[in-house]
């Protein structure tokens, strides 16, 4: 991936591992090695959470479930520390196919909040008495200082019964999902999904993000590039919410925050 010289720090913001996501095809360590070789400065591990395609048994007690869920992150962090790739924690929350990327919190915080469990559309766990909703999620994550990004809001797939938008309950929009537009993508490959996401963000004046949504070592090299190195998720949140200088890429093309083609 050829970087723009003024924006030398590239981050993957949408990343699934075989340890924690059923759809993951490569181990966290192998994916970290691939990202380092591709020129990334860091990654956010965002495995599928309770209401999505998680690999961890939902019948486990909550704290044990969180430990299992975090195995992909822990493995990625261990390998990242060994080879010099920054690895940050996040997750992808699912609500009957509508998904959100969560940043800025920790596994320890997650263990203390069993109310993160959502109702499940697939019938593999008993219904909850008080499941998390999109509205409750926004309040809970914000209270803790985290950030909520609507992932691929216009993707059309059988696992997504309907397109649902929640502009008042998100901090931003994933306007560039590399699986939609990168020529190497073999799934969800429909650029109009990104075009609609850009329009949605502009209509509601929401910040935009970019990520590859990768599940294996077959990288697209999508993500976001910054002028400075991010010290942690807090720097990422600050940059997005304050619309600090950064570029977005699907691994094939570069865009500014208004959606203009840079390169």
Language-model segments: residues:
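C-terminal functional module detector
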Residues: 1-8, 30, 45, 132-145, ...
């Amino acid at each position: 991936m050829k970087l723009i010289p003024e924006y030398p720090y590239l981050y993957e913001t949408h990343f699934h591992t075989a340890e924690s996501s059923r759809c993951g095809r490569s181990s966290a360590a192998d994916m970290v090695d691939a990202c380092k070789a591709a020129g990334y400065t860091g990654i956010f591990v965002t495995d599928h959470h309770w209401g999505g395609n998680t690999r961890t048994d939902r019948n486990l007690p909550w704290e044990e479930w969180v430990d299992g869920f975090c195995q992909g992150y822990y493995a990625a962090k261990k390998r990242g520390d060994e080879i010099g790739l920054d690895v940050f924690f996040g997750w992808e929350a699912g609500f009957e196919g509508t998904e959100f990327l969560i940043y800025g919190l920790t596994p320890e915080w997650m263990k203390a909040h069993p109310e993160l469990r959502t109702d499940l559309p697939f019938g593999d766990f008993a219904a909850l008495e008080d499941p998390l909703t999109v509205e409750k999620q926004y309040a809970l994550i914000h209270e803790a200082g985290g950030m909520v990004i609507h992932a691929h809001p216009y993707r059309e797939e059988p696992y997504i019964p309907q397109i649902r938008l929640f502009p008042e309950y998100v901090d931003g929009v994933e306007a560039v999902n590399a699986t939609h537009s990168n020529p190497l993508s073999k799934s969800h490959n429909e650029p109009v999904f990104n075009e609609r996401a850009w329009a949605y963000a502009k209509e509601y004046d929401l910040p935009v993000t970019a990520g590859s949504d990768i599940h294996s070592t077959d990288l697209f090299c999508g993500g976001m590039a910054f002028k400075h190195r991010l010290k942690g998720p807090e720097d990422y949140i600050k940059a997005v919410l304050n619309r600090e200088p950064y570029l977005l890429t699907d691994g094939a093309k570069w865009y500014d925050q208004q959606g203009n083609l840079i390169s």
